Amino acid sequence: MKNKKAGMTILEIVKWILVALIMAFIIHSLMGNRVSKADFSTVWNAVTAKADSSKMQEGSNQMIRRLYGLDPAQFDEIRLDYPKTNMGAEEILLVRLKKTDDQEMVRTAMESRKKTQMNNFNGYGTYQYAMLEKSQIVIRGNYALFVSAENTAEIVQTFESAL
């Protein structure tokens, strides 16, 4: 009789753990799609204040199309800082989406750019390759960020705080 009660207790514990995990997943999913009302310029300025801007230049809409295959007209706002030289790997792309349905399209474009850059530096640009390995793509609701920098983690933290 005691074994049955102990078995029920373990089963109940497992059940509650599963319920807690499901709730945590749901909350995390909802928070990830939270639309931010943060001003784009404020977020951009916060992010770029943490980056080494001496190694980057501002990208035009044409450059965004060329490097990412994205049409800037599809988004509320989009801005790119990319390497000044072919040997640079520092890069920041910030996008404010018109609709969160575009998250996967933007993520795919960012992943493609990262892969292209890693292929470019594979075998000879070890410093740049390592930087790209640490680069991050972060999507939070209506904002998307791609960052490749020496201090990527710090820039991402600043981005998330600015939202």
Predicted features by range, described:
Residues 2-91, 97-163:
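Soluble, non-membrane globular domain cores that form compact, hydrophobic packing
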